[in-house]
Amino acid sequence: AGTAKGVITNDASLVMVNGRMSQGTKEDIHARVLVLNDGGSRLVFVTYDLNCLDVATPILRQRVRTELGIDPSRLILLATHNHNAPIQINPDNFVYGHGLAERMFGLIQEAIAAERGPVQVEFGSGHGYFITARGNAPVDYEIQLLQVTHQDAPMAMLFSHGTHPAQASRSMIDAGHPGYAMEEIEAAFPDVLAMYSDASGGNQFPRQPADWETRTAEAREAGTAAYDALLETRARELGHELAEAVTRIANGPLEDVGGPITSSIEIVGLPLLPPISREEALKLAEEFPPDVGFVHYPNRYRSTNWVRMLLRYYEKGLSN
């Protein structure tokens, strides 16, 4: 197994996932790589302190196949769902996205060059009860851990938890509470690479104290510095809780999952309902400016692009 880690913080101000332009850096964001080699093939995990990858994904898949002989089914790309990082679906950020592909491919090469073994691969799980779900939905508290050990010392700890991150600022680049968790784990386990992946947590969020709304209102009233300080304090608290939970799992009984590596990838086709009628689409289109066109994130009318596209299909006779 081999590991690598590199900074992927943007130099220029870019549109972040939260819709704001980044205004400096509070904490660097990183990409991390774990390569497992069973002697006949490799499995590559890449995690990154971003909400998504998009632009870099097809580039990486092609390069690992053609230059490294690794099938895309063996390239596992995992985001932390970080909101305070450049979003990849805005055209102004595409150059950054191409740079990400180059940076991450280099880290994959670095991890392969650093392979050592034999290693033991183990799996464990536990719970992190400091999250909640919107409404009355059930909450998935599970934390999963994949630990790679070499010569009785962990060299990589890949863990996941299903939640949006708690960010450390409003308008600065930071890695949120998962970033602080990884920092704490790496400090507690010498020479380990901590890797976090967001699990299925689109409806789940960190649980906040009962007086959180009062504290945030007071901090906003006091100004940006006070508000950011409150956000950072809470993100660090949640990061500590996550790190403690992962450490408990790592120190508990783990299941040996070593052996030959198998991996597959499949595109699943889902049936679609018939589109709404042209008349219904025209009525919907009356609710927003007629000349808005097709717009990208974070434009407020981006969510209505589908109506204009459907009308174009009707105009060209492509709706069936």
Regions found by a protein language model. Give the residues of each.
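Non-catalytic substrate/cofactor recognition surfaces at enzyme active-site rims
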Residues: A1-N320
